[in-house]
Amino acid sequence: MNLMLTAKCNNVDEFKKNGYDVVKKEFDSWCDNSKSIFAKIDDNNLVELFFDVNPVELKKWLEKESTQNIFKTHGFFPTRYTFEGLSM
């Protein structure tokens, strides 16, 4: 399963540096981290792509207090996401 999401946050650069990059190594527990993509749309919007996602492990990671604290600290809020397979 693959995951694409768009999200809002207080400041994308700060979230990338002090949130995403800090916990990126933890992504190994729920996806193929070598393929993960983070892209800034503007100062408050971003897109993330994750591949070969294990939904059970992702749910566990999202429920962790440390993960929730990062989301709260940076005002991270997904605005759209999909687990649909990509097709041409």
Specify the residue positions occupied by each region the protein language model found:
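Short glycine-/aliphatic-rich beta-strand segments at the starts of folded cytosolic domains
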Residues: 1-11
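Short, flexible active-site loop motifs that bind/organize anionic cofactors or intermediates
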Residues: 5, 48, 57-58
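Glycine-rich beta-strand-turn "strand-cap" elements at beta-sheet edges
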Residues: 8-9, 29-47, 69-88
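Short beta-strand segments enriched in hydrophobic/aromatic residues
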Residues: 9, 52-53
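Short amphipathic alpha-helices within nucleic acid-binding modules
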Residues: 14-18, 55-64
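Short amphipathic alpha-helix segments
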Residues: 14-30
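Alpha-helix boundary/capping residues
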Residues: 19-22, 65-66, 74-77
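Short amphipathic alpha-helical segments and helix-helix/interface helices
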Residues: 24-27, 58, 67-68
